[in-house]
């Protein structure tokens, strides 16, 4: 019997062919509740000093608040959270876009999941030698104002040489076409990385324009709470605005191999301390 989280040959074949894989009931209802309850506590203690996050406008990636979030638990507001008067239009807990990017290191509840046997076994199946979580995000996709995430590849932002980023997207609520589930182009990871975000002394830029994608090629990845979506670093994926009346909470981890793969000094995310590996061969 395979260890918990391990992938079968059939699952590995599907992932290799399509660039994504949905694992049903990866986390228990108790694990999901623990993470959601913990985030509610973190938000309750949040003093409101954050920044706005948008994938359409990357100006926020140029500021110090964003850069420092690499090793902090930082709060980012939705673009549409504020009125013309500069005040929140809804309660604080309904105004946050995401919390990142070091929950997996600094919070015991999220660290327990991130360093758990299921996650480690999954990356052992993918033949990672020394995997490490490089960033973590709790994403809210708030009702009515949950922002669009434009088509992208994770390796654009989290590049190693050779490329090694794999994303884990854990649904903490049911994700449907109505409330902003993930969409992906099956097999698009085979076309290679199209562009990179480059960080210099105090700025960021893309080395190539954003490609144009045919929306008809995307398929919805509707999942239940507790399901996990595994995402190849070159897979083209996106999510639309959440215009519904229900949120779509999710936890996102991005994992790289730290053995035989060099973290780019041009990535926006630069750490003072190397990330702790999930395991070492």
Curated annotation (Swiss-Prot):
2-oxoglutarate binds at residues 98, 137, 152-154, 169, 239, 248. Keywords: Dioxygenase, Iron, Metal-binding, Oxidoreductase, Vitamin C. Pfam families: PhyH. Its cofactor is Fe cation; L-ascorbate. It catalyses: phytanoyl-CoA + 2-oxoglutarate + O2 = 2-hydroxyphytanoyl-CoA + succinate + CO2. GO terms for molecular function: L-ascorbic acid binding; metal ion binding; phytanoyl-CoA dioxygenase activity. Converts phytanoyl-CoA to 2-hydroxyphytanoyl-CoA. This is Phytanoyl-CoA dioxygenase 2. It comes from Oryza sativa subsp. japonica. The lineage of its organism: Eukaryota, Viridiplantae, Streptophyta, Embryophyta, Tracheophyta.
């Amino acid at each position: 019997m395979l260890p918990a989280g391990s992938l079968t040959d059939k699952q590995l074949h599907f992932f290799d062919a399509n660039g994504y894989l949905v694992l049903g009931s990866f986390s228990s209802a108790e694990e999901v509740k623990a993470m959601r309850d913990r985030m509610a506590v973190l938000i309750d203690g949040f003093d409101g000093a954050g920044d706005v996050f948008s994938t359409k406008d990357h100006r926020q990636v140029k500021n110090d608040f964003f850069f420092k979030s690499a090793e902090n638990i930082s709060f980012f507001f939705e673009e549409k959270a504020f009125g013309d008067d500069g005040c929140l239009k809804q309660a604080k807990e309904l105004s946050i876009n995401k919390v990142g990017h070091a929950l997996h290191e600094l919070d015991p509840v999220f660290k327990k999941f991130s360093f758990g046997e299921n996650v480690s076994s999954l990356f052992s199946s993918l033949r990672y030698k020394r995997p490490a979580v490089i960033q973590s995000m709790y994403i809210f996709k708030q009702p009515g104002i949950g922002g669009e995430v434009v088509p992208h590849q994770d390796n654009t932002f989290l590049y190693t040489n050779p490329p090694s980023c794999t994303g884990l997207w854990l649904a903490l609520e049911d994700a449907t076409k109505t409330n902003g589930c993930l969409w992906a182009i099956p097999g698009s990871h085979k076309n290679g990385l199209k562009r990179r975000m480059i960080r210099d002394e105090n700025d960021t830029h893309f080395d190539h324009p954003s490609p144009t994608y045919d929306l008809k090629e995307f398929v919805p990845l509707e999942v239940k709470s507790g399901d996990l979506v595994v995402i190849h670093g070159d897979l083209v994926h996106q999510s639309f605005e959440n215009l519904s009346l229900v949120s779509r909470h999710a936890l996102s981890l991005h994992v790289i191999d730290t053995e035989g793969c060099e973290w780019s000094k041009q990535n926006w995310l630069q750490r003072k301390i190397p990330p702790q590996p999930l395991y070492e061969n």
